A protein has these predicted regions:
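Non-catalytic, glycine-rich low-complexity segments
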Residues: 1-27, 80-88, 95
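Residues in well-ordered beta-strands of folded domains
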Residues: 4, 68, 81, 120-122, ...
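Asp/Glu-centered strand-loop micro-motifs enriched in Gly/Pro and often flanked by an aromatic residue
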Residues: 4-22, 44-45, 56, 67, ...
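Extended acidic/polar, glycine-enriched regions
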Residues: 28-97
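Short active-site-proximal "capping" loops at secondary-structure junctions
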Residues: 38, 180-181
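Extended, solvent-exposed functional surface patches
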Residues: 86-154, 159, 167-172, 178-180
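Active-site phosphate/pyrophosphate- and oxyanion-stabilizing loops and adjacent acidic/basic residues
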Residues: 163
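Conserved small/polar residues in nucleotide/adenosyl-binding loops
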Residues: 185-187
């Protein structure tokens, strides 16, 4: 089973909705997903090119959970949370990292105190393409728990927004940092 880079350990899935998983699996097999929040098994056929798609209902906020994907060989995603997920995109004003550019007030203290395991971070690696891409690369190897080690190069605006949401809602929060100063969203 092969999943896109944004389906990893430590991820956050949006609560109270349907999440669409997709990926590649062995030809001639059936893909099964077992969700840790209800131990239900969901099944999807693998098409002639090896691709599959499957929508799975998510519960109210909670976790951590394990998701198990199998086509005969098992892949597990661990420490998965369910809560709020936000996509943060923009140019330099959104890109400015917590430790960067000397403009975040008290950034050393903010980094030292950034211990929020219920806030999860996904940072998209910068890339250009003239055609749509089916996947992205993650700068930190996938979803990470918010900590002093993971926050310095992350978007300060995305981080402070996630922290504010987490304090207000008291649910896991996932933020996706897809920023690039002086860039266009399309050509």
């Amino acid at each position: 089973v092969v999943l896109p880079a944004y389906f990893t350990d430590n991820m956050v899935l949006q609560q109270n909705t349907k999440v669409t998983f997709h990926g590649k699996a062995a030809l001639g097999k059936t893909l099964k997903v077992t969700t840790g929040w209800n131990n239900e098994v969901y099944v999807a056929p693998v098409n002639k090119d090896g691709y599959w798609t499957l929508s799975v209902p998510t519960p109210a906020a909670g976790g951590p959970y394990t998701l198990t994907f199998t086509d005969g060989k098992k892949l597990q995603l661990k420490n998965v949370m369910v809560g709020e997920v936000w996509f943060c995109s923009g140019q330099s004003n959104m890109e400015m990292p917590v430790a960067g550019w000397g403009k975040v007030m008290n950034y050393e203290q903010e980094i030292a105190e950034a211990n929020y395991p219920s806030i999860r971070l996904f940072q998209v690696k910068k890339n250009t393409s003239v055609t749509p891409l089916s996947d992205v690369e993650a700068t930190m190897g996938g979803w990470q728990e918010c900590s002093s080690a993971t926050i310095p190069e992350f978007s300060s605006l995305a981080y402070f927004y996630a922290r504010s949401l987490w304090k207000e809602l008291n649910v896991p929060v996932g933020v996706i940092d897809c920023t690039w100063g002086l860039s266009l969203i399309h050509i």
